[in-house]
């Protein structure tokens, strides 16, 4: 239930907020898409842990690149 709620929040962010902000994610897929995919693939706890790790790596000093779920 919480997992589905988080996925809905991510989708809402992707549709209604992200288009109005400058692209800043250094990875492909984007951090929000990575979070959505990891919640679907791994469930709530492991998905949140993997998302937090990804967000910690998404900064100007990291080269970024392709980082699949």
Curated annotation (Swiss-Prot):
Subcellular compartments: Cell inner membrane
Superkingdom assignment: Bacteria
InterPro entries from the UniProt entry: Membr_insert_effic_factor_YidD
Keyword match Membrane: yes
Keyword list, A-Z: Cell inner membrane, Cell membrane, Membrane
Topological category with respect to the lipid bilayer: Peripheral membrane protein
Principal location class: membrane
One Gene Ontology cellular component: plasma membrane
Family named by the database record: Belongs to the UPF0161 family.
NCBIfam families in the cross-refs: membrane protein insertion efficiency factor YidD (TIGR00278)
Function, in words: Could be involved in insertion of integral membrane proteins into the membrane.
Name by which UniProt lists this protein: Putative membrane protein insertion efficiency factor
Species name: Syntrophotalea carbinolica (strain DSM 2380 / NBRC 103641 / GraBd1)
